């Protein structure tokens, strides 16, 4: 499994926004510079995250972005799946390759193995949330 560059940038952008004081907006320029993400690419990512319900956008000269919900309620899995779609670790788990790994000897054991591994990874990513960065960032700014 390899995380896409787009997901990596999205995770970094959300991490950045989670460290800001609750009433402060993050501008595209500020996030782009702080996280070293190309501005044009970041704009598309932030739009996707806004459509996905993770961010709120505010127009105008003083506009920007902020989290739409508490950082503790935004998981890494949520961000990855908004950006890249459902997380899949193998052809065996996407529902399109039914029986792809099956043979008469293993009776789907290989397919079951990959499905179990996918559950482990998804559970781990769903337990990782941005609240941990929010606390750290706000502590460092005081």
Q: Where are each of the predicted segments found?
A:
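Short amphipathic alpha-helical interface segments
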Residues: 10-22
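Short, hydrophobic-biased segments on the C-terminal half of alpha helices
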Residues: 14, 46-47
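A short alpha-helical element within helix-turn-helix/winged-helix DNA-binding domains
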Residues: 26-36
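Alpha-helical residues within the helix-turn-helix
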Residues: 33, 50-51
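Key DNA-contact positions within bacterial/archaeal DNA-binding proteins
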Residues: 40
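Beta-hairpin "wing" of winged helix-turn-helix
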Residues: 53-62, 66-68
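Non-DNA-binding regulatory cores of transcription-related proteins
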Residues: 68-142
